[in-house]
Amino acid sequence: QTKQVENWDKCPEDFDVANFYGGDLAGVLSKMDYLEELGVEVLYFNPLFVSASSHKYDTQDYDYIDPHFGVIVEDGGEPMPQDCCDNRQASLYKARVTNKKNLEASNQLFIKLVEEAHRRGMRVILDGVFNHCGSFNKWMDREKIYDDAEDFEPGAFATKDSPYHSYFHFQNDNAFPDNLTYEGWWGHDTLPKLNYEESPELEAYILNVAKKWVSPPYNADGWRLDVAADLGHSQEYNHLFWKKFRNVVKEANPEALILAEHYGDPKDWLQGDQWDSVMNYDAFMEPMTWFLTGMEKHSDEYKDYMLGNIENYENTMTHYMASFATSSLQCAMNQLSNHDHSRFLTRTNHKVGRAANLGTQAASEGVNKGIMKEAVVIQMTWPGAPTLYYGDE
């Protein structure tokens, strides 16, 4: 269950994966006046679709907003017993995320949020995780979430006869039932990689998802694409897919924005037929971080010679900005902080390490707000779209 935060100056509690850490669409709606007062023009949400994790980059159902973010109309069942690892016993979670009343009500709340954002002149961008899904996903259902649910087909983990068998690549097609030989993204068995080249049905489904959420009645204004260059098993297919993706999205909503998470040279995807732009790591976040803090963006390394190194800063910016067409550069996501890296303010303390080894309190020790303000001045005046991570304001 979500928690209400009463003291925003207090350091968050130590991470608890079973305790969805607060925040939902109703909360965003309640803060619309505040967001409008700040001058916010676009709300970019991390994944909102059904998922058992807090981060939700392991999608369980692409067709519905997670009821923990949306609306729980009907509740039931019990939380999973402490120290239990059998997800079949997660009856409370299963009841919430398979109940169609909860799912439909959550989608309706998202519609309301987008309508309110549009009324105030704001736009809404969704996070699309299409390279992989989660092991909880209804297509795989390794965790047996949908075993007893109505109107759901058997998952590919359980049987070769599943209608979703082709959605995944199994190294051993004779290892059913409960086939553990499916391909996981970077070897993670909780993140089954989607098998587009061998499944026209999967490709059609995801393209329909892309179209659905930027069309009435949902009317989102674009997509941010997670690990977009990893999708598929070849560069040839990757480019082909994103061309198809662009066609269906732009046909449904010509004004929709398509941004990709990408590290390295994005030129091949920014030819006007795939992505509009990218999260600007190479030509903004990284050089800004090295120049103003001397820190690597995860806080994993400090290099004294990079701090204040104007020559390196200028050369890096010039080199990587040359990879962009002007139109792509002007809408590139210029971030100082985001969900994948330490906060910029934390980097100003020059402490090397993460919460796991330093403790959460270290993130706020010895920080320099003056450096943060310098960074924001540059961010707000640099070519591109200044993008604030929730809380940095």
Predicted regions and their residues:
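Substrate-binding/active-site clefts of carbohydrate-active enzymes
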Residues: Q1-E41, P47-P217, F245, E251, ...
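Active-site rim elements
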Residues: A18-Y21, K100, N195-S199, V227-H233, ...
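Loop/turn elements at helix/coil->beta-strand transitions in domains of secreted/extracellular proteins
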Residues: E36-L43, H118-I125, Y218-W223, N253-L257, ...
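A cross-domain feature marking catalytic cores of carbohydrate-active enzymes
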Residues: P47, L126-H132, V227, A260-H262, ...
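Short regulatory "switch" loops immediately downstream of catalytic or recognition motifs
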Residues: Y64-G76, K144, D230-G232, T289-E296, ...
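Active-site groove signature of glycoside hydrolases
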Residues: G128-H132, I206-S234, N334-N338
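Acidic-and-aromatic substrate-binding clefts and catalytic sites of carbohydrate-active enzymes
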Residues: H132, E201, D230-L240, P266-K267
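Conserved alpha/beta catalytic core and glycan-binding cleft of carbohydrate-active enzymes
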Residues: F136, W242, R246-N247, E255-D392
